[in-house]
Curated annotation (Swiss-Prot):
This is Molybdenum cofactor biosynthesis bifunctional protein. One of its GO terms (cellular component) is cytoplasm. The gene is moaC/mobA. SUPFAM superfamilies: Molybdenum cofactor biosynthesis protein C, MoaC, Nucleotide-diphospho-sugar transferases. Keywords: Cytoplasm, GTP-binding, Lyase, Magnesium, Metal-binding, Molybdenum cofactor biosynthesis, Nucleotide-binding, Transferase. It comes from Synechocystis sp. (strain ATCC 27184 / PCC 6803 / Kazusa). The keyword Lyase applies. GTP binds at L167, T168, G169, K179, D226, D255. Substrate binds at F75, C76, H77, M116, E117. It holds the Pfam family MoaC.
Length: 347
């Protein structure tokens, strides 16, 4: 039965007067694909055009749209908006275009949900980006608009996206080159892990320092550039958590030469959404292998707290929280390759 039709099949607004108010939340997302011409106007995470700062304007427009949803969608109820937050991140996708990932989260305490408000907000923010950038190029695509979370009401929706991070580092002194560029499987290992994660994740990124992969076989892969001073793997993990706080992260380091589909599938199958992370367990000492793990949005608060107190070791950070530890099928599965001798054992 369609609730927006009465007994005479005439449209109506649903009567919610008998419903009980409660906390409700919805998160929607979409992607705006922009041509490479826009890169000339990009500074950090903002696009500066004659019309003004694009991202800031999009956030303002999207917030206004959230509050005006009932004026735009005929049968939406007017309701109080208690919170509205946008997360917008610009990432490079290959050489010929870039993408803007938008998320809009809306909160209320009322009798009906706010999923339409979240969808309206993220859509208008995307349209605002289109409007401001169309003078540079009309080759702009708005895509993948969807609701990814709804809580409160009759039914919860939890479609937390899974993103992947290939955790790289600098040049290894003992190996003589960056581990992401070492060939274990007939291609640079960073490319191998990227392709592996792409089978399971909506988006995959390489961690990077500024310009780290220019002039290498990895230069066309999407990257997340470390925010602030680089302090090892912690920087890449925290940057990912900060860039997309509402998603799950499958994080694999290039140190792991034996990583394969079976290991990844086991990690995903046993992941706990109610915990900070699910990781493989170190066979010798029982600590979480932080560089081969499934991280939930709960990890952001933990890693931010660790950064604030000067703790930069991912293993020690995870030991501060409840984690799901799973045993590898083979002891060498999560072995780190740190020397030419280790590399020789593979080949």
């Amino acid at each position: 039965m369609f609730t927006h039709l009465d007994e005479n099949q005439q449209p109506r607004m649903v009567d919610i007067s008998q419903k009980v108010a409660g906390d409700r939340r919805a998160v929607a997302q979409c992607i705006v694909q922009l041509p490479k011409a826009i890169k000339d106007y990009l500074t950090g995470q903002e696009i500066f055009l004659k019309k003004g700062p694009v991202i800031q304007t999009a956030i303002i427009a999207g917030t206004m749209a959230v509050k005006k949803t009932a004026d735009l969608i005929p049968f939406c109820h007017t309701l109080p908006i208690h919170g509205c937050k946008f997360d917008i991140n610009i990432v490079y996708q290959k050489r010929d275009y870039l993408e803007i990932f938008l998320q809009c989260a809306v909160n209320t305490n009322y009798k009906t949900g706010v999923e339409m408000e979240a969808l309206c907000g993220v859509s208008v923010a995307a349209l605002t980006i289109y409007d401001m950038c169309k003078s540079i190029s009309s080759e702009i695509i708005i895509k993948n608009t969807k609701l990814i979370e709804k809580t409160g009401g009759k039914a919860d929706v939890s479609q937390t996206p899974l993103y992947g991070l290939v955790l790289t580092g600098g040049k290894s002194r003992r190996m003589g080159k960056d581990k992401a560029l070492i060939n274990y499987q007939g291609q640079p290992h960073g490319q191998y892990i990227y392709d592996l994660l792409a089978k399971y994740c909506e988006q995959v990124f390489l961690s990077a320092r500024p310009s780290q992969w220019q002039g290498t076989p990895l230069e066309n892969l999407p990257t997340l550039v470390d925010r602030g001073e680089s302090v090892g793997p912690m920087s890449g993990i925290l940057t990912a958590l900060q860039s997309y706080p509402g998603v799950n992260w499958l994080i694999i380091a290039c140190d792991l030469a034996y990583i394969n589909s079976t290991m990844v599938e086991k990690l995903i199958a046993q992941a706990r959404q109610d915990l900070v992370a699910t990781c493989y367990e170190n066979a010798d000492q029982g600590f979480p292998e932080a560089l081969c793990g499934f991280y939930t949005p709960l990890a952001l608060q933990l890693f931010t707290k660790a950064q604030n107190i000067g703790l930069h070791c991912p293993v020690k950070i995870l030991q501060m929280a409840d984690c799901q530890l799973i045993k590898p099928d083979n002891l060498f599965d999560i072995a780190n390759i740190n020397s030419p001798e280790d590399y020789g054992q593979i080949n």
